[in-house]
């Protein structure tokens, strides 16, 4: 199932123009009778017109949101879906989401101050 979700997001992100789902969470993953996972609910999806552009609106569900969405004026790209997908994987492994005590909470202030989400993902400062 995890691979199905990743392939679904890859499909969205590699389309021309690419699509950012923006609300990837467990309740938006449907399972077929054969056990295949399918991404659903594209109500918040955004079509990106440029590979270099950043989206600037706050959307999604808090427990699955990437840290860059917590900024007062968020700028983000397809990587927010990757982060949300990781939260779905966490939920699949743990059978629940953590009680708002995310390991990256310590980074929250740094991200809001610096708006440097690229170094958050790459580890480069």
Q: Which role does the model predict for each range below?
A:
Residues 69-79:
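Conserved end of the kinase activation segment
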């Amino acid at each position: 199932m995890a691979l199905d979700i990743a392939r679904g997001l890859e499909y969205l992100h590699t389309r021309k123009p690419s699509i950012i789902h923006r609300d990837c969470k467990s309740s938006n993953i449907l399972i077929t009778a054969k056990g295949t996972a399918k991404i659903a609910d594209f109500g918040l999806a955004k079509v990106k017109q440029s590979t270099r552009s950043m989206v600037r609106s706050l959307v999604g569900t808090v427990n699955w949101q990437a840290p860059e969405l917590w900024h007062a004026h968020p700028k983000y790209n397809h990587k927010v879906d990757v982060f949300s997908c990781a939260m779905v994987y966490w939920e699949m492994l743990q059978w629940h989401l953590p009680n708002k005590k995310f390991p990256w909470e310590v980074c929250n202030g740094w991200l809001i101050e610096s708006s440097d989400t690229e170094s958050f993902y790459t580890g480069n400062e």
